[in-house]
């Protein structure tokens, strides 16, 4: 495992509460864990889809009418019908939603934030950019990016100046690589994993081609040594780095691998690569809001992530990036004299110094830090959705979220592998390809089914209103989110999953 100061070392701490306790396989035990959960109040801050919601063919019940007969209208959120409908909805049986690694659930406050934005735009027009209001949830439009950065920074272990909430994930990776990938005849390779998320692969490949290089020569793929165990051991990654050290300019790896759920040793890999003169970037899409990151302390050069997974900002929500403070410094005196004063980057007006931004003098001096990498003014609509969720995260800490996540996912693993009826691995129709060491994974468990079972298992789970994620041909990804998932849900999922496997096996015979 190496020297991993950034994770809770399970084996060195007290035993998890469900170990060696036969009661752990009962519903009452799971409910007891929920009663003792210090984060349990956060579940009420999210809208959990009901079984009726999932099966309904329309977005609104009663053909767009409330049960009172009034038409649904979200423009008037003070209408008694709206609140009555919300009260009625909570009485429906909720689905089991274990898919926060794909799309997080909607915070209840999201609508309030967006309503405030719409009202500001409607009643203030362009003055909404600059005029503060006593009842505002966010500052005027011109300053919303600062509000997002302030809330995001502690979630990824960064200084506020090192974070910018902006753009989309792949676009941000391109911007960062345009700045940090500076190939020379001697050093022009980029090292990535062989099974990287396709968009990352495409981005790296196109960056190499952009510099008139051939990916066959300049792209190093770290492939799993054992296809039956698609995990990249840290020592193996370091060996690949050593083998290519003198010809490599950049490394881009995922903090957490999207398919296996493996949590890479960011601190160790970063330090090792940098000791060889290589810049290191991380795709934190599956890590932000999931594990307790320390991007500043680990000396990461740059990172990027989306906000629609564990950060619950909605489909395609605004992304974010990190640039370590040593790369974000701007020498104002040098810039004033026209000399090179900051790290090279693609530039846009919103990244310019706020004091001179509106002078329109075509002399670009970036803001200090990651803010200087911004291009255009951010979508205030999207920023409100981001901030609505980040406010919840800032009511606790990533250390507390990670602590519950370790227990919650560990409990799920325990129920799947240690159930007396399925403990015999030879008879079990599935295996878990995610690392068994809790320090080497996030919330997600990737479960590989025997060939031919996936569709039948998914059909059964769908009938029971269980929402998880699939990866063809035979893997499901299950990710309990600590802010809104419960131990009782995990227990119920394990029961339904075992039943689904039994049905699938019977159907195959």
From Swiss-Prot:
It catalyses: L-kynurenine + H2O = anthranilate + L-alanine + H(+); 3-hydroxy-L-kynurenine + H2O = 3-hydroxyanthranilate + L-alanine + H(+). One of its GO terms (cellular component) is cytoplasm. Pyridoxal 5'-phosphate binds at residues 169-170, 197-200, 283, 286, 308, 349, 377. It is an enzyme of class 3 (hydrolase). GO terms for molecular function: kynureninase activity; pyridoxal phosphate binding. PANTHER family: KYNURENINASE. Keywords: Cytoplasm, Hydrolase, Pyridine nucleotide biosynthesis, Pyridoxal phosphate. Catalyzes the cleavage of L-kynurenine (L-Kyn) and L-3-hydroxykynurenine (L-3OHKyn) into anthranilic acid (AA) and 3-hydroxyanthranilic acid (3-OHAA), respectively. The gene is bna5-1. Its cofactor is pyridoxal 5'-phosphate. Its EC number is 3.7.1.3. InterPro entries: Kynureninase, PyrdxlP-dep_Trfase, PyrdxlP-dep_Trfase_major, PyrdxlP-dep_Trfase_small. HAMAP family: Kynureninase. Belongs to the kynureninase family. Disulfide bonds: none annotated. Pathway: Amino-acid degradation; L-kynurenine degradation; L-alanine and anthranilate from L-kynurenine: step 1/1; Cofactor biosynthesis; NAD(+) biosynthesis; quinolinate from L-kynurenine: step 2/3. It is found in: Cytoplasm. It comes from the Eukaryota. This is Kynureninase 1. Homodimer. GO terms for biological process: 'de novo' NAD biosynthetic process from L-tryptophan; anthranilate metabolic process; L-kynurenine catabolic process; L-tryptophan catabolic process to kynurenine; quinolinate biosynthetic process. The modification N6-(pyridoxal phosphate)lysine is found at residue 309.
């Amino acid at each position: 495992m190496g020297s991993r100061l950034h994770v809770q070392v399970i084996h060195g701490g007290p035993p998890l509460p469900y170990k060696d306790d036969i009661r752990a396989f009962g519903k009452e035990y799971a409910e007891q864990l929920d009663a003792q959960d210090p984060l349990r109040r956060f579940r009420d801050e999210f809208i959990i889809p009901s079984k009726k919601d999932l099966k309904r063919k329309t977005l609104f019940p009663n053909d767009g009418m409330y049960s009172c007969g009034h038409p649904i209208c979200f423009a008037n959120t003070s209408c008694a019908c709206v609140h009555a409908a919300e009260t009625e909805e909570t009485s429906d049986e909720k689905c089991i939603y274990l898919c926060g690694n794909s799309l997080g659930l909607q915070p209840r406050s999201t609508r309030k934030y967006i309503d405030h934005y719409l009202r500001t735009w409607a009643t203030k027009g362009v003055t909404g950019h600059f005029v503060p209001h006593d009842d505002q949830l966010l500052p005027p439009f011109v300053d919303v990016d600062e509000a997002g950065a302030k809330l995001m920074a502690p979630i990824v272990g960064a200084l506020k100046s090192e974070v910018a909430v902006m753009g989309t994930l792949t676009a941000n990776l391109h911007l960062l690589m345009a700045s940090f990938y500076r190939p020379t005849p001697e050093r022009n390779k980029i090292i990535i994993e062989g099974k990287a998320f396709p968009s990352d692969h495409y981005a790296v490949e196109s960056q190499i081609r952009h510099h008139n290089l051939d990916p066959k020569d300049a792209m190093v793929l770290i492939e799993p040594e054992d296809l039956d165990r698609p995990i990249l051991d840290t020592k193996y990654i370091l060996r690949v780095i050593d083998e290519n050290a003198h010809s490599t300019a950049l490394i881009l790896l995922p903090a957490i691998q999207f398919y296996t759920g493996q949590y890479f040793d960011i601190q160790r890999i970063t330090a090792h690569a940098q000791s060889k003169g290589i810049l290191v970037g991380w795709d934190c899409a599956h890590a932000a809001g999931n594990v307790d990151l320390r991007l500043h302390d680990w000396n990461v050069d740059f990172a990027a992530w989306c906000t629609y997974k564990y950060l619950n900002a909605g489909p395609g929500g605004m992304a974010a990036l990190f640039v370590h403070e040593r790369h974000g410094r701007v020498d104002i005196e040098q810039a004033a004299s026209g000399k090179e004063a900051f790290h090279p980057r693609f530039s846009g007006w919103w990244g310019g110094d706020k004091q001179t931004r509106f002078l329109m003098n075509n002399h670009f001096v970036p803001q200090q830090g990651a803010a200087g990498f911004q291009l255009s003014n951010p979508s205030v609509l999207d920023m409100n959705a981001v901030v609505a969720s980040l406010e919840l995260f800032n009511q606790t800490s990533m250390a507390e979220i990670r602590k519950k996540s370790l227990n919650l996912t560990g409990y799920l693993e325990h129920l799947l592998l240690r159930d007396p009826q399925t403990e015999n691995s030879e008879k079990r129709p599935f295996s878990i390809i995610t690392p068994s060491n809790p320090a080497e994974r996030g919330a997600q468990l990737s479960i590989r089914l025997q060939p031919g079972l996936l569709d039948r298992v998914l059909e059964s789970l769908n009938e029971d209103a269980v929402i998880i994620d699939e990866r063809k041909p035979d893997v499901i990804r299950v990710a309990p989110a600590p802010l809104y998932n419960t131990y009782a849900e995990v227990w119920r999922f394990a029961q339904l999953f075992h039943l689904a496997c039994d049905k699938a096996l019977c159907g195959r015979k």
